[in-house]
Amino acid sequence: MAVEAAGKGNDTGESAATTVLGKPGVLHGSRTLLMQTEDGQVVEPYSISAGLDYPGIGPVHAHLYETGRAQFYSVTDDDAMRAGVQLSRLEGIIPAIETAHAFAALNQMKFNNDDVVVINLSGRGDKDLDTYIQWGKY
């Protein structure tokens, strides 16, 4: 399973959800899914998270998506920020905003009672404190 940044929403023009909005194209010499115009020009992506603000996905991820071997979820800025704040309050861990997207996607997924879920809690949220504060006005 993978999570993409939906920014302000996939229908707003301010998103980075390549599997939702992208088409096959070439970027940096690799054929992959790419957010682009009809004539192949890269579309400016948007995400509150700088690490997810990219107009494409890697060729391996594109292949996994196209062959149905991976499920991709898209998460808005607001949902990611709420998940990051919730993790901070419940566990005392401030996640990087990139990782907060993964926690927010849990609400979209279905699990069995005996499933084991692993989330790679990468990055440090202290670098994102200003963004969390601006977003939540805490």
Report the location of each language-model feature:
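Catalytic phosphate/nucleotide-handling subdomain of diverse soluble enzymes
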Residues: S15, A105-Y138
